[in-house]
């Protein structure tokens, strides 16, 4: 993937930055930097309790397009929106069934994804053109801190080229997406 050198107007190959973060001593500066990349529409791969996710600003149509491009994924394949706080669910959904709170309190944070009617805040690029949005709240502390630093809503399919095995390490992500995304944490 190419990026523009704003100073000289020259296109150059993107270099993916890797920031090693110890889950027992989280580098808040690295989290803030990754969050800023996401807020500005860039892509950051990050760990969850299952696999590495390819994070983007879930409320940014252009960020969704970048996700599909980096993965080589069809744009009608919806992305899952990750949240860090249950209260954030009401901003991106409508007509939430009462059973949701019971499920969320039992299974979130954790690897449960629930599907809801989307609010107007969520672009169709994120939902693959659907009127519904898939939402989950990961239990991984690094993931949750990143989601908060990014503004609360991060779309994140697995951080791999479509059709390849889901990555379980930063090295797997690097081998597959180096040069296509801004950062791996």
Kindly label every feature range from the protein language model.
Residues 1-5:
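Short, low-complexity, charge-dense intrinsically disordered segments
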């Amino acid at each position: 993937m190419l990026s523009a050198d704003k100073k000289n107007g020259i296109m150059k190959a993107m270099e993916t930055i890797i920031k090693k973060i110890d889950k027992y001593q989280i580098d808040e500066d690295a989290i803030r930097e990754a969050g800023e990349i996401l807020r500005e529409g860039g892509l950051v791969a990050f760990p969850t309790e299952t696999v590495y996710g390819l994070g983007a600003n879930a409320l940014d149509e252009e960020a969704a397009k970048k996700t599909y491009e980096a993965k080589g994924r069809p744009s009608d394949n919806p992305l899952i929106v990750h949240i860090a706080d249950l209260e954030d669910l009401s901003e991106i959904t409508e007509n939430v069934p009462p059973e949701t709170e019971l499920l969320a309190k039992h299974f979130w944070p954790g690897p449960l994804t629930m599907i809801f009617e989307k609010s107007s805040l969520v672009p169709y690029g994120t939902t693959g053109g659907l009127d519904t949005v898939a939402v989950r709240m990961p239990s991984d502390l690094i993931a949750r801190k990143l989601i908060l630093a990014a503004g609360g809503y991060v779309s994140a399919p697995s951080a791999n080229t479509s059709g390849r095995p889901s990555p379980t390490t930063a090295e797997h992500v690097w081998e597959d997406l180096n040069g296509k995304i801004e950062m791996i944490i």
